[in-house]
């Protein structure tokens, strides 16, 4: 998701820092993990490297800006102060990941719906709602991922869940909720094969 990281976080953050003379973006990258299917890899976390001229003020601006830009829960700000490694949690938005089955459904289902059509349907379902927007798709042989960032993963799912009655591609999809509530920080449901019933 490097392109989305660049447009959503990197460029606006660098603009805010440079406007105050507080620093600039010096790099970034992603850590990958091996998925269950052989040969498939997924992003575990993305990072942005920042050079700050004034740690205290620049740090406050960095936290404020990233939170305003919608940093998701689980994000961290790692830095060194007085030769001590520090880490602060940031981000108040929840995540909803929808992994569509890209292998086990009937061939005619894949023929009828492409990822562009699916993206447009997801966008329409959320239009005018302050709950989130779809990002993706990210495609592997086994699954296709669309992910959403917003104040409530539950509310996002409430808006897109009715689409399963219209699009059979929702059958057997995995839906992963990443929430602020530490008791239910990450939960997963599986939409049944008879998702249209």
Task: Kindly give the residue locations of the regions a language model identified.
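Short, surface-exposed beta-strand/loop "edge" segments at domain boundaries and coil↔beta transitions
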Residues: 2-6, 85-87, 104-109, 155-157, ...
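Short amphipathic alpha-helices in soluble, non-transmembrane regions
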Residues: 9-15, 58-69, 158-165
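Short proline/glycine- and acidic-rich turn/helix-capping motifs at secondary-structure junctions
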Residues: 31-34, 77-91, 174-191
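Acidic/negatively charged segments and metal-coordination signatures
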Residues: 8-15, 49, 55-57, 96-98, ...
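Short, intrinsically disordered low-complexity segments
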Residues: 22-59, 129-158
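Surface-exposed, low-hydrophobicity interaction/linker segments
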Residues: 2-33, 100-131
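Structured core of small recognition/catalytic domains
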Residues: 130-193
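Surface-exposed beta-loop interaction hotspot
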Residues: 66-120
